[in-house]
Amino acid sequence: MKLKHLVSIVLIAIVLVMLMRNNNSMTNARPLVYRESLDEVAAQINDETLTLRDMAFYVGYEEYQIQQEALVYDPDDPNRYWSMRVEGGFMNAVARKNAMQMALHDELFYQMAMKEGIALDDDDQKHMDNKLEDFWEDLTERQGETALGISRKDAKKTIQRIAYAQKYQEVYAQLHNRTYDDYAYTEDPYQKLLKKQKYKVNNKVWNRVSFGNVTYNNKKKED
């Protein structure tokens, strides 16, 4: 009887562990509600973290770019474009990857700019203000700021950091006898620079950002 009782306890324990693992897997696969998850860490580079609040600009920007293409492809059902398989995976996954790569790129050059004491001039400030106006207008037209849970101040902070990053990217390129575009996030010289850094993407959080359905509603249509 004691042996049977012990076996029963072990079997129950195994079942409970399997149920917990299954529940965790389902949670990790479930899209998160972006505006409720702003403090979640999406990535880290050189001991600096990027939360979903920090990533919000990139989500809004990348979704807008892809949505314009999706509406050309199929105005009635843009989700078809977002769900399309392309080089590198499905379009929504590629968009997610691109947004993260842009954010890591800008954060790295921002860190380097701060280390070198880079300052913004009046032209930089004007360009930054124009970029903020364009982004915020596009975002609020689709009520994206509500979906992302960010304020204009949050967007301005990110765009300002991007301005510093872009300015130092130009300086860094000149120092290495390269062009500005050589250090775009897709290019080999930048990728080699990135490999020298200590960085990590928190895929448990980032993969739950449902690109195409954060600031837009591109749910699959029923037949």
Each language-model region and where it sits:
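Alpha-helical scaffold segments that flank or form the walls of functional sites
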Residues: 97-100
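Short, low-structural-confidence N-terminal segments
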Residues: 1-91, 191-223
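Solvent-exposed helix-coil-helix hairpins and adjacent flexible coil/strand "hinge" segments
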Residues: 172, 181-182, 186-195, 202
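Charged, solvent-exposed helices and adjacent loops that form client-binding or oligomerization surfaces
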Residues: 65-95, 114-185
